[in-house]
Amino acid sequence: MEDFVRQCFNPMIVELAEKAMKEYGEDLKIETNKFAAICTHLEVCFMYSDFHFINEQGESIIVELDDPNALLKHRFEIIEGRDRTMAWTVVNSICNTTGAEKPKFLPDLYDYKENRFIEIGVTRREVHIYYLEKANKIKSEKTHIHIFSFTGEEMATKADYTLDEESRARIKTRLFTIRQEMASRGLWDSFVSPREAKKQLKKDLKSQEQCAGSLTKVSRRTSPALRILEPMWMDSNRTATLRASFLKCPKK
């Protein structure tokens, strides 16, 4: 899964996800599904914001090409992806400037057109179930909730989807592509089901035990559960695509 994430997502998103997991003391070598989920969530937040601006008349417009002569303001402030200290600094600044009520939990975005914070959700389950979980956690009518699924479904507060249909379709298409790519690599079942993930973990450990008596030297740079994998960077630049080679038991 880690190899897939590094190949599938923009290096900047991968780096932000790594920092987020490190900040919370989580090991991406072990919690690879969480690593993939964080990258997916980050990308959706960025796609949500992409190309959306507010012009001089205060109208929301979509601009896909940079125009240096246009006096435009980004419609959305991206809060997700920042470290907690900086994220709260941005939230406090927005509240002081706009008079918005300070949220109890860090939101993902702020919409300058609608003057509201937005919580973005990406779920592998039913959208309405995840929506209710988000709503029960946030307990604030001031924060707008928008949930996307990998099956193309979505749900938003008061059925207000904020973005135009084309922008939302772009997000849904990307999520569907991620799902298809995972499925083609045999990763989707373990990603969508914790039970399947545990089965895969046991399978990896069993493979490791079978290799224990061989002469194959296993890298200690990876977590115990994933020692049968030996990631090899093809260059030192983190913006390059990760290639991986898999250690196998030698034939007897």
UniProtKB/Swiss-Prot annotation:
The active site is at residues 80, 108. It is found in: Host cytoplasm; Host nucleus. Its main location: host cell. GO terms for molecular function: RNA binding. The record marks 195, 198-199 as: Important for efficient shutoff activity and nuclear localization. Signal peptide: none annotated. The record marks 28, 65, 202-203, 206 as: Important for efficient shutoff activity. InterPro entries: PA/PA-X, PA/PA-X_sf. The keyword Iron-sulfur does not apply. Keywords: Decay of host mRNAs by virus, Eukaryotic host gene expression shutoff by virus, Host cytoplasm, Host gene expression shutoff by virus, Host mRNA suppression by virus, Host nucleus, Host-virus interaction. GO terms for biological process: viral RNA genome replication; viral translational frameshifting. The keyword Coiled coil does not apply. The probable endonuclease active site in the N-terminus and the basic amino acid cluster in the C-terminus are important for the shutoff activity. The C-terminus acts as a nuclear localization signal. The C-terminus is recruited to host protein complexes involved in nuclear Pol II RNA processing. Belongs to the influenza viruses PA-X family. Plays a major role in the shutoff of the host protein expression by cleaving mRNAs probably via an endonuclease activity. This host shutoff allows the virus to escape from the host antiviral response. Hijacks host RNA splicing machinery to selectively target host RNAs containing introns for destruction. This may explain the preferential degradation of RNAs that have undergone co- or post-transcriptional processing. This is Protein PA-X. It comes from Influenza A virus (strain A/USA:Albany/12/1951 H1N1).
